[in-house]
Amino acid sequence: MNINEVINYAKGXNLDTIEALLILELILKTKKELIIANIKKSLTKKEKKLFFDQIDKIEKGIPIHYILQKKEFMGIEFSLNKHVLIPRFDTECLAEEALIQIQQNGFKKILDLCCGSGCIGLSIAYYIRKKVILSDISTKALQIVEKNTKKLKLEKFVEIIHSNLLKCIKGKLDIIITNPPYLNKEELEIKNKIKKEPTKALLGFGKDGLNISRKILNQAKEKLSPNGLIIIESAPWQIKSLKDFAIKKGFSHLKTIYDLEKRARALILGQRDDTSIRNCTFNQDK
């Protein structure tokens, strides 16, 4: 079989051409542009076996990005493995909003909480060259953060802390950006049949999946500076409940962030109702 034929085979297994080329890049250790240029080239027996083995894994529900061990986020390639969630395009809206708030407000103490692969915090450090703290309860996740930090040459801008939420974070914070686990058990059962991603990074506990998010907000009230912000992601259907809880705890709801499909994806919450203290304009979203 030649390259074109195995790509067509992959399409029959519900992969698109780009995904098939990414697998071929991994196997042939050749850039996809060169692979395309040699589309009629025959594969060796070993290469074909490796390719079909990867297709078999994907058909069994293993995400392609765990096979590739990489995923692009905010225009940056991040290494990953089965111990961290695969960065989502939807989450880029958090990182983009965080960049705006950090620059407009001159925030210096920045935390990416429940950081996973580090894609949010490292993207911030990469683009604005400010120090960012990245924290997670999973030591295996933090090993990936360390790998990505070195890969991006961001060592002098990054502090990595092993912590159960905010327990081991010292001092006041200007901004917390967090994409915590927020699935409930029912959602997790459905998702795990498809995605095979780490339960610890997905399960938010509680009937509504928001127990961890509520713990974060409870702890953040004491850890944020007087003018501090928290940007917290959730599922679209959870946003109202999370906002109501935050307001009861004394946060001001400054903005709801929407993804490109116009779904409510995250909240920006502040310590004070007086938004004029910040050097930016928020669109109030009641």
Curated annotation (Swiss-Prot):
Top-level class of the enzyme under EC nomenclature: transferase
GO molecular function: nucleic acid binding; protein-(glutamine-N5) methyltransferase activity; protein-glutamine N-methyltransferase activity
Residues that bind substrate: 179-182
Gene3D superfamilies associated with the record: DNA helicase RuvA subunit, C-terminal domain, Vaccinia Virus protein VP39
Keywords, comma-separated and alphabetical: Methyltransferase, S-adenosyl-L-methionine, Transferase
Catalysed conversion reaction: L-glutaminyl-[peptide chain release factor] + S-adenosyl-L-methionine = N(5)-methyl-L-glutaminyl-[peptide chain release factor] + S-adenosyl-L-homocysteine + H(+)
Matches recorded under Pfam families: MTS, PrmC_N
Record-listed S-adenosyl-L-methionine binding positions: 136, 179
InterPro entries: DNA_methylase_N6_adenine_CS, HemK-like, N5-glutamine_MTase, PrmC_N, RF_methyltr_PrmC, SAM-dependent_MTases_sf, Small_mtfrase_dom
GO BP terms in the entry: methylation
Catalytic activity, EC: 2.1.1.297
PANTHER family for the chain: HEMK METHYLTRANSFERASE, MTRF1L RELEASE FACTOR GLUTAMINE METHYLTRANSFERASE
Function: Methylates the class 1 translation termination release factors RF1/PrfA and RF2/PrfB on the glutamine residue of the universally conserved GGQ motif.
HAMAP family registered for this protein in UniProt: RF_methyltr_PrmC
Similarity section: Belongs to the protein N5-glutamine methyltransferase family. PrmC subfamily.
Name the record gives this protein: Release factor glutamine methyltransferase
Organism: Borreliella burgdorferi (strain ATCC 35210 / DSM 4680 / CIP 102532 / B31) (Borrelia burgdorferi)
High-level lineage: Bacteria, Pseudomonadati, Spirochaetota, Spirochaetia, Spirochaetales
